[in-house]
């Protein structure tokens, strides 16, 4: 939360070869949590370091496990909220010039896509809202909690991201790897012609 520390973190990351941060994003039917670091970073323009968001779309629980016990804030889904959510991101976050993109498309990751009642429809809604603003999206799903493979991508994601230690292997269009894979060709990031080439580090 301290601006000076964020600057130091970015400098340290750049020094050791990282070229972007992935911030966890908490959205509960319009209610945001732990948003201060991202909001301050957006307002100040500092650090001048690439970033993206990953939506931690699970229940907010006392045990921090995303489960069904001791739920403090429940994660609920609706088409109305899908539209409100992506509009907020398009208007307030994705426009930032530091935001990580692939082929000009802002990259947005979903932590647990298997929890959505209709992930395919949510993706359709997100892309509709982006198109209405003359934009496109590059959507990724995190392979975790035994939800991994080609069938998970088939609902409309562009790529998959491993989340160790929950996924020992990624499976994308018949390809297997131990690193991030590309949905366009199934190759690892090192072999794909148009991969997500920006290494990222997750931060809350």
Residue ranges: model-predicted function:
Residues 1-204:
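Glycan-processing catalytic domains of CAZymes
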């Amino acid at each position: 939360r301290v601006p000076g520390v964020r600057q130091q973190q970015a400098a340290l990351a750049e020094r050791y070869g990282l070229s972007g941060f992935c911030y966890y994003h908490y959205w509960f039917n319009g209610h945001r949590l732990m948003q201060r670091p991202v909001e301050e970073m957006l307002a100040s323009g500092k650090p001048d370091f690439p970033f993206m968001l990953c939506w931690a779309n699970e229940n907010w629980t006392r045990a921090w496990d995303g489960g069904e016990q001791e739920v403090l804030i429940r994660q609920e889904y609706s088409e109305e909220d899908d539209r409100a959510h992506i509009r907020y991101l398009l208007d307030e976050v994705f426009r930032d010039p530091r935001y990580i993109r692939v082929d000009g498309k802002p990259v947005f990751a979903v932590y647990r896509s298997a929890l959505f009642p209709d992930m395919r429809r949510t993706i359709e809604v997100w892309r509709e809202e982006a198109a209405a603003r003359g934009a496109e999206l590059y959507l990724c799903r995190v392979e975790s909690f035994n939800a991994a493979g080609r069938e998970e991508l088939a609902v409309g994601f562009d790529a998959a991201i491993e989340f160790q230690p929950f996924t020992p292997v990624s499976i994308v269009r018949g390809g297997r790897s131990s690193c991030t894979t590309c949905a366009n060709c199934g190759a690892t990031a090192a072999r794909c012609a148009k991969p997500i080439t920006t290494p990222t580090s997750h931060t809350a």
